[in-house]
Swiss-Prot record:
It comes from Rhizopus oryzae (Mucormycosis agent). It is found in: Cytoplasm. Keywords: Cytoplasm, NAD, Oxidoreductase. The active site is at H175 (proton acceptor). This is L-lactate dehydrogenase B. The gene is LDHB.
Length: 302
């Protein structure tokens, strides 16, 4: 357990509860508090998680928005879900209002707090959260394409018969329709992925579609995704809290492009400590610029 490691999770839904559950068993938090506008949901989740906490050393309880604002790390999972046939702009409008209320309720937010946004559209909402909170851009991070990258590495691990943790490959850009895979920079054991005989046989478009479409397939079959993103959010908290200096693809403000989207970033106590520029082919750079254009076209980023 790390001294001064209080984590607040805003949102007691499936993603918030999954994040709390995954984080509990890392035994790095002095305390986890859960905050939600629905007191019954908070009580139910805390009671249920407290049973699991009996085999963990992490206290968990309900908390207030004001307490959340004084936590070391604030994980925002509360947000409206996209309705069937609803335009993306309408979802942004609804989640903007939710985010504005959340951040307003937490004020004053600790000047050294780290905010992790785990709500879609995550790139846009991370940008908005940074603006509303008044914190420095390096202190406000979105989950971005971390889960997409994990899915890609698992998929490639199956193809190349190697542990996914030994694969260095990234999904970059917007977490959404315009995200892209940096194939040229991908490697296994220091050897470029493009140099493997199997690479020539890869259907890269099919892989990209499978990675970006996996969430919708899960939603179609059971209504929502939460375990995977909860585990990823907990891992990001772990990385920051232990100052691990690990590199993950997360939503960050990238000055070169003038937008918030996913690039590999070194994470530690101060949040984002360094953003790494991935070598891309001309075709890949063009795809990344499509992400930039898609995000800049959104009214709330203007």
């Amino acid at each position: 357990m790390v001294l001064h490691s209080k984590v607040a999770i805003i949102g007691a839904g499936a993603v918030g509860a999954s994040t709390a559950y995954a984080l509990m068993f890392k035994n790095i938090c002095t305390e986890i508090i859960i905050v939600d506008i629905n007191p019954d949901i908070v009580q139910a989740q805390v009671l249920d998680l407290a049973d699991a906490a009996s085999v963990s050393n992490t206290p968990i309880r309900a908390g207030s928005a004001e307490e959340a604002g004084q936590s070391d790390i604030i994980v925002i999972t509360a947000g409206a879900k996209q309705k069937e046939g609803e335009p993306r702009t309408k979802l942004i409008e609804r989640n903007y209002r939710v985010l504005k209320n959340i951040i307003g309720g937490m004020q004053p937010i600790r000047s050294d707090a780290i905010i992790l946004v785990v709500v879609n559209p995550v790139d846009i909402l991370t940008h908005i959260a940074q603006t509303l909170s008044g914190l420095a851009p390096n202190q406000v991070i979105g989950s971005g394409t971390y889960l997409d990258t994990t899915r890609l590495r698992v998929h490639l691990g199956d193809i190349f018969d190697v542990n996914p943790q030994s694969i260095h490959a990234f999904v970059l850009g917007e977490h959404g329709d315009s995200q892209m895979i940096a194939w040229e920079a991908a490697s296994i054991g220091g050897q470029p992925l493009t140099s493997f005989p199997e690479f020539a046989e890869l259907d890269k478009k099919a892989i990209s579609k499978a990675i970006s479409g996996k969430a919708m397939e899960i939603i179609r079959l059971k209504g929502a995704t939460f375990y995977g993103i909860g585990a990823c959010a907990a891992d990001l908290v772990h990385t920051i809290m232990l100052n691990r200096k690990s590199v993950h693809p997360v939503s960050v403000y990238v000055e070169k492009y003038g937008v918030t989207f996913s690039m590999p970033a070194k994470l530690g106590w101060r949040g984002v400590e360094k953003i790494y520029e991935v070598p891309l082919t001309e075709e890949e750079e063009a795809l990344l610029l499509k992400s930039v254009e898609a995000l800049k076209a959104v009214e709330y980023l203007s």
